Amino acid sequence: MNFLSNSVQKIIDKIGNKKYIKQEDIDNIMQEINPALLKADVDYEVVIKFNELIKQQTLNMEILKGLTPQQQVIKIIQNTLTNILGSQPLPLNLKDNKLNIFMLIGMKGSGKTTVAGKLAYFIYKKKIDKILLIAADYHRPGGIQQLQQIGKNINIEVYTNNDTNDASEVILQGINYAKKNNFQTVIIDTTGFSPEDEISVNNLALIKKNIKPDETFIVVDALGGQRISGKIKQINEKLSFTGVIMTKMDAKTSGGLILSIRYITKLAIRFISSSEQHNDDNFEFFYPERIASRILGMGDLSTLIENIENKIDPKQNAELIDKLFQDNYNYYDLQKHLNLIKKMGSFQKILNFIPGIGNKITNLNILDNNIIVKFEAIIQSMTH
């Protein structure tokens, strides 16, 4: 996601130790940034606006005391990215003492069904136990079965009805079932659609009108291309989404579409999702400031610290470190440490959180988590 990291380094080199930023300097800065933005699938309209905002803030700017020219320009770029992305995170609308209904809508292949499971698991980790997934994606072969398997994997009930393929009927039945059985949250996996399919969009709008969900999320593939933003803007006029969930945001995905979606549709990005697994680190609450930092290759220490706190047992880690300094550290202790590292997710993702590192280690073989598996196999093959 750090698609501007190389540009940042070139900006630092070009500005040097100048006391004032002139028009020529701004032009040089944008010559570095614009190609990177376009290559990362940022819409041309957004690139133009980004240029305007940067120029407004940097032209004839006096360098503040305590900052270098490079630091101040990069800070302006980071703040501009943050403002485009939304400035403040928007929390999930979870209410007590009522049934929360979340409706997931997405184009075909967006990863909507996988997101349904991830959102359910995310809410479950918030200590909300009674969650119901409603399988209503009847048009995609295997869609119902996929959600059933996901529900089984994360131990969350899935409502289905094999006697009908009417999505609207099944959704209403599922909600009634949830109310009768005191569920706290319902997550509805709807049928995927094509932007040109007005019938499907109208059907989804009718379903939404009937069930009045608390949240209606549009699930968007981060690899969908620049044109997707305009299509979502049009569809939003009928479906009134409350937010966007971006999928396929893996370490090697540029992520530029996030800027386009946010600026063109004016919809808040609520979550970002990566991988098919239902782990905590594969489904993240969206913090605009943190994402802006990642885009610039400046890391994201706040998220890294949260992951460590959530996944690493501090007592176990302290015991292993004590053994290491007491010269009492053996291969079995190493294996325990490797397991702790695996809980954190992929090496690539961990290192991308560290400022100045993510953009320099993309092609290293050490980033392959299979190396941990190999180490473990070697340790387990050893004799006592």
Language-model regions, residue ranges each:
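Primarily NTPase-proximal linker/entry elements flanking Walker-type ATP/GTP-binding cores
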Residues: 7-136, 143-163, 170-179, 184-188
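Alpha-helix N-cap/helix-start motif at coil-to-helix transitions, marked by capping-box chemistry
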Residues: 2-6, 24-27, 44-48, 141, ...
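Conserved phosphate-handling catalytic cores of large alpha/beta enzymes
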Residues: 171-175, 179, 183, 193-209, ...
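Redox-cofactor binding/interface segments in oxidoreductases and associated redox assembly factors
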Residues: 188, 218, 352
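Polybasic, Ser/Thr-rich amphipathic helices
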Residues: 1-19, 291, 348-352
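Extended, compositionally biased non-globular segments
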Residues: 286-384
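Short, acidic/glycine-rich phosphate-metal binding loop used to engage nucleotide
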Residues: 163-165, 222
